[in-house]
């Protein structure tokens, strides 16, 4: 018998984008358990997993609108990965109609919850002219204080910070460079 994933293990898989591969590797044996945890217990990580399975037809018949609904439920409970993925989907028009303003809302929430992918994508949208200049300081602050050991990502962050800085008042930049806890 295949063991059901712990919440922490599932969140780790979601963050590494291996959650759907794991369900398939487990030969789709946990579908009913996953659905129950999403539907009855309303566990955010399981709502996200179930939503992703439905959206892409992994081990179940594809039902994209139901899948997005479960992802939205997980996002509404504050799951950073769900907020980031919905933001990415709206930014790119994946499964949903492209809506970059809506993407900013989801990505801002995920970015505030320290999701680095969301922080980067949010600044990309700001640099494209979406969002509010009032949010630049927070976005700069989060990205400025981010930590990554990926050299390419580090260079991208530095480049984005330099570009965002040009759109900001010098005082806002100074304030944004404060340490994370202040």
What are these regions (language model features)?
Residues 12-16, 49-56, 85-92, 121-128, ...:
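Hydrophobic face of amphipathic alpha-helices that form TPR/SEL1-like repeat modules
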Residues 5, 39-47, 56-58, 63, ...:
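Short helix-capping/linker turns of helical repeat alpha-solenoids
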Residues 1-39:
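N-terminal leader/linker segments that initiate helical-solenoid repeat arrays
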Residues 23-32, 61-70, 97-106, 133-141:
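Structural signature of tandem alpha-helical TPR/SEL1-like repeats
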Residues 35-36, 72, 108, 144, ...:
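Alpha-solenoid helical repeat scaffolds
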Residues 48, 82-84, 120, 136-141:
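Extended, hydrophobic/aromatic-rich amphipathic alpha-helical segments that build helical scaffolds
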Residues 113-117, 121, 139, 163:
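Alpha-helical protein-protein interaction scaffolds
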């Amino acid at each position: 018998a295949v063991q059901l994933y712990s919440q922490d293990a599932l969140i780790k898989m979601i963050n590494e984008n291996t959650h759907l591969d794991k369900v398939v590797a487990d030969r789709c044996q946990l579908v009913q358990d996953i659905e129950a945890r999403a539907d009855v217990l309303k566990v955010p990580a399981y709502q996200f997993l179930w939503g992703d399975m439905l959206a892409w037809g992994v081990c179940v018949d594809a039902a994209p609108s139901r899948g997005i609904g479960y992802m939205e439920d997980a996002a509404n409970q504050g799951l950073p990965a769900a907020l980031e993925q919905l933001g990415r989907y709206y930014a790119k028009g994946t499964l949903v109609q492209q809506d970059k303003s809506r993407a900013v809302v989801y990505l801002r929430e995920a970015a505030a919850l320290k999701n680095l992918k969301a922080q980067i994508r949010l600044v990309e949208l700001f640099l494209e002219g979406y969002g509010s200049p009032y949010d630049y300081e927070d976005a700069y602050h989060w990205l400025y204080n981010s930590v990554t050991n990926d050299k390419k990502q580090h260079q991208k962050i530095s480049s984005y910070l330099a570009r965002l800085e040009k759109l900001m008042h010098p005082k806002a930049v100074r304030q944004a460079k404060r340490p994370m806890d202040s």
